């Protein structure tokens, strides 16, 4: 790399002078550890096709195929989140069972991407790395923000850490799904129980596994106690600017885009919806 720029002390690094499509296996391994440590890593001026993006994800493990998101034909897991992409790019996409095309759901702060969240927390093994590549970027606005849940945990007192360690919480899916055992019962949210504090398998660092949208209650506490503790933890994450990074996407030359790759397990993210019509 020509340059490695740490955007903040706790979270966010930009790599200059490398093409993701040309990384050696050793570089891919080093990048994986860097993402685990820095939470999110950015690459501008990337010549990256959907196939090359998919291949990089496939190197790291099984690619998550979202059941409700459109994907590039032949590349399950190469999700498209821009509802005009098929028209603009001429790609053949699968839009079956898709609600991402309804941008009211994105703009609405209660259910959309402009509220802090972690993806797929309801799964037995929540998604590891997420790779977002943008080929079209508005002239202004559309920033994306990340929180380091490592740093959020580190802000807690030792006594409070002891209180939280071993506690489990209930996590709910962002979307509703049909139960194949009861298809006539209608779509329902999926709930899963996970530890509230977890340890990253690569770094060995503890992190706080909460987000305001999908962490609903702590087991073993009364509803009032659970709400009080969770709201405090949400505030620790959301109100401490020193554990956050805000990334500004910038236009590059035609045919090139910008990539962000983050560790979904140890982070929260949100967009800033100020670019409608741009």
Language-model features, listed with the residues they occupy:
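Fe(II)/2-oxoglutarate oxygenase catalytic core
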Residues: 2-261, 265-278
């Amino acid at each position: 790399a020509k340059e490695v720029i740490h955007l903040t002390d706790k979270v966010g690094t930009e790599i200059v002078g490398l093409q993701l499509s040309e990384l050696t296996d050793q570089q891919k391994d080093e990048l994986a550890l860097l993402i685990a440590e820095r939470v999110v890593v950015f690459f501008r001026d990337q010549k990256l096709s959907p196939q090359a993006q998919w291949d990089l994800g496939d190197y790291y493990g099984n690619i998550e195929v979202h059941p409700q998101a459109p994907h590039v034909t032949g590349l399950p897991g190469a999700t498209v989140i821009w509802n005009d992409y098929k028209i603009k790019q001429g790609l053949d996409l699968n839009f079956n069972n898709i609600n991402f095309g309804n941008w009211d759901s994105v703009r609405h702060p209660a259910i959309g991407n402009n509220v802090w969240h972690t993806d797929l927390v309801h799964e037995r093994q929540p998604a590891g790395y997420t790779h977002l590549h943008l080929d079209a970027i508005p002239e202004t606005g559309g920033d994306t923000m990340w929180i380091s849940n490592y740093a959020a945990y580190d802000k807690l007192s030792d006594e409070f850490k002891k209180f939280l360690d071993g506690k489990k919480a209930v996590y709910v899916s962002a979307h509703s799904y049909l139960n194949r055992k009861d298809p006539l019962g209608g779509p329902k949210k999926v709930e899963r129980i996970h530890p509230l504090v977890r340890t990253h398998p690569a770094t060995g660092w503890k992190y706080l596994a909460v987000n305001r949208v999908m962490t609903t209650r702590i087991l073993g506490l009364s509803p009032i106690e659970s709400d009080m503790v969770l709201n405090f933890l949400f505030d620790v994450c959301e109100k401490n600017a020193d554990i956050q990074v805000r990334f500004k996407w910038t236009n590059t030359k035609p045919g090139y885009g910008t990539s962000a790759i983050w560790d979904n397990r140890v982070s929260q993210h949100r967009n800033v919806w100020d670019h409608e019509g741009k």
